[in-house]
Amino acid sequence: MAFQKVVKGTILMGGGALATVLGLSQFAHYRRKQVSLAYVEAATCFSEPVNREPPSREAQLMTLQNTSEFDILVIGGGATGCGCALDAVTRGLKTALVERNDFASGTSSRSTKLIHGGVRYLQKAITNLDVEQYRMVKEALHERANLLEIAPHLSAPLPIMLPLYKWWQLPYYWVGIKMYDLVAGSHCLKSSYVLSKSRALEHFPMLQKDKLVGAIVYYDGQHNDARMNLAIALTAARYGAATANYMEVVSLLKKTDPETGKERVSGARCKDVLTGHEFNVRAKCVINATGPFTDSVRKMDDNDVVPICQPSAGVHIVMPGYYSPENMGLLDPATSDGRVIFFLPWEKMTIAGTTDSPTDVTHHPIPSEDDINFILNEVRNYLSCDVEVRRGDVLAAWSGIRPLVTDPKSANTQSISRNHVVEVSDSGLITIAGGKWTTYRSMAEDTVNKAVKLHNLNAGPSRTVGLFLQGGKDWSPTLYIRLVQDYGLESEVAQHLAKTYGDKAFDVAKMASVTGKRWPVVGVRLVSEFPYIEAEVKYGIKEYACTAVDMISRRTRLAFLNVQAAEEALPKIVELMGRELNWSELRKQEELETATRFLYYEMGYKSRTEQLTDSTEISLLPPDIDRYKKRFHMFDEDEKGFITIVDVQRVLESINVQMDEDTLHEILCEVDLNKNGQVELHEFLQLMSAVHTGRVSGSRLAILMKTAEENLDRRVPIPVDRSCGGL
């Protein structure tokens, strides 16, 4: 053991010395660049956008169809694809982008929500003396600073705690984290620091206390990934790019080069998924930025091409916010099987993940129960035994497919690259693959540089460093106060709008419906527990939302926060969208069914029915069954064998509890398995059994019944002498 520590110490010091030398050697170079990414003056940008608002989808389709030839056509509407479109259009190139599904519908909306340089990559760079890993971390840290600056409403620094349970880990990880700060240089968000055991438990009281020796806190960035992706797409559209979601590339167009006699890619045959209409989009250069689907587009160009994408599934789960501090995350650097697990606060909930396992490429990745349970077990290992971590506490879960790649130029074709690869085919198709969210901008710059050089396009240098994304330019931390004062919004709703839409929050507020209450004046919520309002559905359509799934998962983030709340909001969302888009009753029903399937399969939603009926037996002891029957019969006064909303209202009125009818309907619907408007005794017992075993985290009806029982039991008869003699 002592020998291992000495070896580790030697490697650490040697690697640290190397990284220090490399960092110092690069310092002068970055000083000469005269661009500080952390403090860019984006207000002095080269020009204002062409459009104050993004053109409608219909207008974009007309531009795609009627333009004789674009300079660049980008296939793929994820972060990298939209980044390429923004980079190209701001250089003065005539740019188009098509996406088969919605913007950020794939990997870009299913991330860990971190903007990070990669602490674990730096660890590998030091221990393996890997210069490539070091450069990748350095680039990511500079891009992190830029992203935090250009979209301040969607991103923010986040302190992350690294709890330590062995004394030798303290100096080991402290040096490593300090190297992380050093590599960031002037773009370091805040300096890392050490916490004692007591201070660590103050910040994170649920931590496993036994053998805890202390903790190290470092800083990375966090963002709303789908909204960030959308902001990039909308910014590109405002600068003049013809961007369209739900446009599938059916085939690539080719023409013969008169000079070489070779076939060259010259555009794509595109199909509007919503209408079935097809037309050609011609371009001098076509960029393949399709993430996990990289090889499918490459095979359109050349069916014999060797695949380069090595897809890997990363599963995340969302748990209630009380599982983590409001403004501090946690990193487990070495799980039971050697992976890294993050435990992060996000949108007042807690994200835990991720896994890393080989997978097949699919449009509809499903989080497996094994991966969900793996994450739950790792969470249990790090939290105090006082905290019961239950499967029923998983409010949402998703799987994202990482597009890891092998470099086709590398002699070792089996080596997986965590960096990005820009490949050019014989026909001129440019493919950008790999990389990560944080470095989308530099990946896009490299790709467009390659396109300009290869196709001799007339373009200036990249201008996306410091270029504010939609909503970021006039945002300030106090913007929400004006929303409260000027429009009469709830403070929570106003804060949500400000950090979601930035300076465009005023446009959303103008669409907000009057509540009919004294306060708030405007802003009718979609569901009571979350600050999303009806006006966001109307505004989401202006942001190219075409389906109910777009709205619950990427315009709002309800599906990623609580699938049950998303399901509750669906009928209202479909009705609002139907009114704006003139949907027929049949289309509304189709949207409702499609969105429900999406929640059920892709967002880890075991429906309430399935949760309650996993076992045909009710696993309760006889005394418990008797107690729950007593509660049930207290509501079922007429001994009908079921309870209705009228029964619940009657009991609540008797104990002076006021609750509106809509909320009561929601509460009963949670338990009404056969959806007949009645909660029967066996349904209630199944619910209580599921709560008891932890398959569901709780029930509003169960809590309501318990409260009523306790209040009624506390009542005592009024003595005769206090009741005027009983007259």
Swiss-Prot record:
EF-hand domain residues are 623-658, 659-694
Please provide the record's keywords in A-Z order: Calcium, FAD, Flavoprotein, Metal-binding, Mitochondrion, Oxidoreductase, Phosphoprotein, Repeat, Transit peptide
What InterPro entries does UniProt report for this protein, alphabetically? DAO_C, DAO_C_sf, EF-hand-dom_pair, EF_Hand_1_Ca_BS, EF_hand_dom, FAD-dep_OxRdtase, FAD/NAD-bd_sf, G3P_DH_FAD-dep
Q: In which compartments does the protein localize?
A: Mitochondrion
- State the superkingdom: Eukaryota
In what pathway does it function? Polyol metabolism; glycerol degradation via glycerol kinase pathway; glycerone phosphate from sn-glycerol 3-phosphate (anaerobic route): step 1/1
Its main localization is mitochondrion
Where in the sequence is the transit peptide found?
A: 1-42
PTM Phosphotyrosine: list the residues.
Answer: 601
**Cofactor(s) listed:** FAD
Which residues does FAD bind?
Answer: 71-99
Instruction: Give the UniProt record's GO annotations in the biological process aspect.
Output: camera-type eye development; gluconeogenesis; glycerol catabolic process; glycerol-3-phosphate metabolic process; glycerol-3-phosphate shuttle; multicellular organism growth; NADH metabolic process
Membrane-spanning ranges? none
GO annotations of cellular component type: mitochondrial inner membrane; mitochondrion
User: What EC identifiers does the entry list?
Assistant: 1.1.5.3
Note how its activity is modulated.
Answer: Calcium-binding enhance the activity of the enzyme.
Write down the top EC class of this protein: oxidoreductase
Family, similarity comment: Belongs to the FAD-dependent glycerol-3-phosphate dehydrogenase family.
What function does this protein fulfil?
A: Calcium-responsive mitochondrial glycerol-3-phosphate dehydrogenase which seems to be a key component of the pancreatic beta-cell glucose-sensing device.
Q: What is this protein called?
A: Glycerol-3-phosphate dehydrogenase, mitochondrial
Say which species the protein is native to: Rattus norvegicus
